[in-house]
Curated annotation (Swiss-Prot):
Annotated residues for binding of ATP: 11-16
Family recorded in the similarity comment: Belongs to the CoaE family.
Catalysis: reaction(s): 3'-dephospho-CoA + ATP = ADP + CoA + H(+)
PANTHER family according to UniProt: BIFUNCTIONAL COENZYME A SYNTHASE-RELATED, DEPHOSPHO-COA KINASE-RELATED
Organism annotation: Syntrophotalea carbinolica (strain DSM 2380 / NBRC 103641 / GraBd1)
Main EC class the enzyme belongs to: transferase
Pathway: Cofactor biosynthesis; coenzyme A biosynthesis; CoA from (R)-pantothenate: step 5/5
Residue ranges occupied by any DPCK domain in the UniProt entry: 3-206
Listed EC numbers: 2.7.1.24
Protein name in UniProt: Dephospho-CoA kinase
């Protein structure tokens, strides 16, 4: 089984690329999904977050107040570091279990869709890394449109991540997502053929869904 790490800057279209891999037959594990799982009400990770950030980080019913926490960490670098120290090990352990289960099920290719793959040190959990590349201005406009942010807030979120140039320098493969969806899909198809020749999956021209 080959585990392929998939990452890129926020607003790069990485989720669309992940869905393209899925349509080709890859098993996709989403770090964002794992991150949501580890902070369910009553979980040890959520308890640690509450101890660090106080009662304001919880909604009335005991769930994580994501809006409050996002505002906090994007304006306070130390808060982000503290949150990462709490959540990254828990996400890594859950990912390890998922990979083990997929290996047991004889999966051929697993794509680990992880926005903070390098920042979290999760590149050590994968066999190779694909970085989705997009021009900064395109990334900025997509992020503003997707999340309803003004330019300053969008740039703040972009700046909170590792610079794209650094990610590209550490990549094994690059998907250029500056063009059309069809051009991006063609790159994914070519990479799949290179990594797992002969792998049979659903129609590679099936529509990918944005995320």
């Amino acid at each position: 089984m080959l585990v392929l790490g998939l990452t890129g800057g926020i607003g790069s279209g990485k989720s669309i690329v992940a869905e393209m891999f899925r349509t080709l037959g890859a098993k996709v594990v989403s770090a964002d999904d794992l991150a949501r799982m580890i902070v369910q009400p009553g979980s040890p990770t959520l308890a640690r977050i509450a101890r660090r950030f106080g009662a304001e980080v919880l909604c009335e019913g005991g769930a994580l107040n994501r809006a409050w926490l996002a505002k906090k960490i994007f304006s306070d670098p130390q808060a982000r570091l503290d949150l990462d120290r709490i959540t990254h090990p828990a996400i890594a352990e859950l990912a390890r279990r998922r990979f083990a289960a997929l290996a047991q099920a004889s999966a051929t290719l697993v794509v680990y869709d992880a926005p903070l793959l390098f920042e979290a040190g999760a590149d050590t959990q994968v066999d190779a890394v694909v970085v989705v590349s997009v021009a900064e201005e395109v990334q900025l406009q997509r992020l503003m449109l997707r999340d309803g942010l003004d330019e300053q807030a969008a740039r703040s979120r972009m700046d909170s991540q590792m610079p794209l140039d650094e990610k590209l320098a550490r990549a094994d493969y690059v998907i250029d997502n500056n063009g059309s969806l069809e051009q991006t899909r063609d790159q994914v198809v070519a990479l799949m053929a290179r990594l797992v020749p002969g792998m049979k999956g659903p129609d590679p021209h099936a529509s990918g869904s944005a995320g």
